[in-house]
From Swiss-Prot:
Protein family membership: Belongs to the TPT transporter family.
Organism lineage string: Eukaryota, Fungi, Dikarya, Ascomycota, Taphrinomycotina
GO CC, any one term: Golgi apparatus
Alphabetical list of InterPro entries matching this protein: Sugar_P_trans_dom, TPT_transporter
Record's keyword annotation contains RNA-binding: no
Keywords, ordered alphabetically: Membrane, Transmembrane, Transmembrane helix, Transport
Residue segments, region Disordered: 1-55
Pfam families: TPT
Annotated source species: Schizosaccharomyces pombe (strain 972 / ATCC 24843)
The name this protein goes by in its record: Uncharacterized transporter C22F8.04
Coiled-coil residue spans: none
Localisation: Membrane
Length: 383
């Protein structure tokens, strides 16, 4: 007598459940079906043959055990959706503000000692890639998943990141920190423009009013500025444009690839690129010939501190974006800009002129209005 066991199943993952978390065997996938209520069930054809019945009972028992594991995992709270404590948010926001200010102030101080932006970037990026590599070496949770050979598929990401960071650094080299926020004041308008052109995202009237206020702050700050060379303002506008391209273009890569892998590959390649460019432009040669003694020691010490701050800034920024809302993030950016301007006056001996004060205020108020308006639109749309 012959008998036939029929297993009819299709697996559909539960809501908010990653199917990869529960794939233990191919048999487990081939023997489950999800009904309209979202509960898994098994279907077997009946047979009078004792051997078939024994096989059927054995398979059923194993499947029921696997299903119990699935249901238990489904009932577990999602750690990503769990409420974040206020203490965590406070440390994330405060750390991002502190390290961002440190990076800007220390970079400007290093450039005041030795005007070698490419050499500085090369060292910082090499330091960052080394720190990420050491973290992977001693971590039991995170491991490297992408190799440097993957750079070919990340060429657009690497290009826009290098372009954006080099532009920002050269802008900082030609303008004082107290004017840095104003010189890059067109970042928000450029981002809105590129989002419309590339992503077809439209901006309503109220958020656009905040954008107009930002443009007014930029125009007011630049129009009455007589202490900054035109090249600094031009680099500020160019830096705003390249940063806007960066913010719009890299979203795809951030969601598709692990963050640490992107940081490592980008930092390693940018370090080599900036070093080669420093050699080709004779920046490295002039630095070696002209810098000696205590000047070189001071530059190296500041460079170490800025590189360490830059590494922690990457971690703090990603953490803040993860645990806070866009409104909280933009408010922290505004607070950082004000503190950064005041610290530039206190520690770098810069002068805060009237046009810079009004320009920064208009840019920050416009940015906050735009952010609050967009957040209101988001809540209305999701209601």
């Amino acid at each position: 007598m012959s008998s036939k066991l029929t297993v009819n199943a299709h697996y559909s993952p539960l809501k908010d459940e990653d199917p990869l978390d529960h794939i233990d065997s191919q048999t487990a996938l081939d023997s489950m079906e999800t009904d309209s209520t979202g509960k898994s069930s098994l279907y077997f054809s009946k047979s009078d043959d004792p051997l078939s019945k024994d096989i059927e009972d054995g398979i059923s028992t194993r499947k029921l055990e696997e299903m119990s594991v699935l249901e238990a995992n489904a009932k577990e709270p999602d750690s990503e959706n769990a409420p974040v404590s206020r203490l965590t948010i406070f440390f994330a926001v405060s750390s991002q503000i502190v390290f961002a200010i440190l990076v800007t102030i220390l970079n400007k101080q290093a450039l005041n000692i030795i005007n070698a932006p490419l050499l500085m970037l090369s060292f910082q990026m090499a330091f960052t890639s080394l720190m990420v590599k050491m973290y992977w070496r001693f971590s039991s949770v995170h491991f490297q998943t992408l190799r440097l050979a993957s750079a070919i598929q990340l060429k657009k990401f690497i290009f826009v990141k290098i372009l954006g960071i080099v532009s920002k650094t050269y802008c900082l080299a030609f303008v004082p920190v107290s004017f840095y926020q104003i010189s890059r004041g067109l970042l928000l308008p450029f981002t809105i423009l590129l989002s419309f052109v590339l992503l077809k995202q439209k901006t309503r009237l109220f958020p656009f009013g905040g954008c107009l206020l930002v443009m007014l702050g930029f125009g007011f700050g630049v129009r009455f500025e007589s202490h900054v060379a035109p090249i600094g303002i031009i680099l500020g506008v160019w830096s705003s444009f390249t940063t806007a391209i960066e913010s719009v273009a890299v979203k795809h890569y951030v969601h598709e690839y692990p963050t640490l892998d992107l940081i490592y590959i980008f930092s390693a390649l940018m370090s080599v690129f900036c070093l080669l460019l420093s050699v080709a432009s004779l920046e490295l040669l002039h630095t070696v010939q002209e810098v000696v003694g205590m000047q070189a020691i001071k530059f190296f010490i500041v460079l170490i501190l800025s590189s360490l701050s830059n590494f922690y800034l990457n971690i703090a920024t990603f953490t803040q974006i993860k645990v806070t809302s866009p409104v909280t993030y933009m408010i922290s950016v505004s607070a950082r800009s004000i503190l950064q301007t005041l610290l530039a006056v206190a520690f770098l001996g810069e002068t805060l002129y009237g046009n810079r004060i009004y320009g920064v205020i208009l840019i920050l108020v416009g940015t906050l209005l735009y952010t609050l308006a967009k957040e209101h639109e988001r809540r209305v749309a999701s209601a």
